[in-house]
C-alpha cells in the first residue's frame, strides 16, 4: 500500500467499501498476482486508487459492475453481485464517487474520490 495525503470520512463504512473492491480484485487476480492501493490528495479531493493485474473487466460488463445483483461474465458464480453496488452506495453517501476502468490485458483500476468539504 502506497499512501500520501489525508482522508476525512467515515472510517468503518469507507473500509467496508474498499474491502469489497479489494475482494473483487482478489477474485479476478490469479495466484501470485498483484493488487496495489494508492492514496493521494490535492486541493480539491482525496483519492484512493486500487489496481490489480488480473483478468480485467470485459467491455460488456464495465457499464454494469456497480449495479445491484450484477455478476460479470467472468464471475465464478459464488458471489451475489452486491459488493460493488454496496461500495458505490457507501461512497456516494459520503459525497464521493467511484469509477472502474479496464486495464485489459493487465487488470482493472478502481478510483474512489472524495471531494474536500463534502465529507
What are these regions (language model features)?
Residues 45, 57-70:
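Short conserved segment of the HATPase_c
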Residues 52:
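Acidic ATP/Mg2+-coordinating residue in the GHKL
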Residues 32-44:
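Short beta-strand/loop element within the Bergerat-fold HATPase_c
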Residues 95-96:
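Conserved glycine-rich
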Residues 6-9:
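Conserved micro-motifs of the catalytic ATP-binding
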Residues 25-26:
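Short helix-loop "hinge" at the ATP-lid/N-box region of the Bergerat-fold HATPase_c
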Residues 83, 87:
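Short alpha-helical Gxxx[C/S/T] motif in the catalytic ATP-binding
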Amino acid at each position: 500500500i502506497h499512501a500520501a495525503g489525508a482522508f476525512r470520512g467515515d472510517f468503518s463504512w469507507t473500509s467496508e467499501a474498499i474491502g469489497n473492491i479489494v475482494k473483487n480484485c482478489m477474485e479476478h487476480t490469479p495466484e501470485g498476482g498483484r493488487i496495489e492501493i494508492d492514496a493521494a490528495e490535492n486541493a480539491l479531493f482525496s483519492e484512493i486508487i486500487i489496481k490489480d493485474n488480473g483478468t480485467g473487466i470485459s467491455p460488456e460488463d464495465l457499464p454494469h459492475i456497480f449495479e445491484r445483483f450484477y455478476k460479470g461474465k467472468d464471475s465464478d458464480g459464488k458471489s451475489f453481485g452486491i459488493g460493488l453496488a454496496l461500495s458505490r452506495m457507501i461512497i456516494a453517501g459520503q459525497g464521493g464517487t467511484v469509477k472502474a476502468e479496464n486495464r485489459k490485458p493487465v487488470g482493472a483500476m478502481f478510483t474512489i474520490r472524495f471531494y474536500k468539504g463534502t465529507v
